[in-house]
């Protein structure tokens, strides 16, 4: 599926849900202490969706990947601060909420990693580099690969002695 807007990306939706959850969590009195924990936790969680959005809007795969890695790092930072918070007795009443947010951050991190992995293995350099000629070349290559695969499957049936058994 091709997404035209970052707001439609499932990973961005997960990231924004994480940020909203963190903002709600940090309204608790535990986070009303001297220090920067509240602010840093909020900034890190919001950084995830912001970096996904910025990378998506850049137009090249290389730039998108760079921003996805930053977003993934912010997921880790958010999770680390949530783990830090869990070590104190005062926020025991927030245990369930913190656990849910850690899971959400992990989910977001996995989605970002999967997307980044698929982009690294892609021949497309990004929307900025797509024009009619490069689209045609890409589509022709995909059709050729599909045809070669179909041809090999047919030959395996007709001449099985020429092909070793497929590894599973």
Name each model feature, range by range:
Residues 1-168:
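Amphipathic alpha-helical assembly/interaction segments
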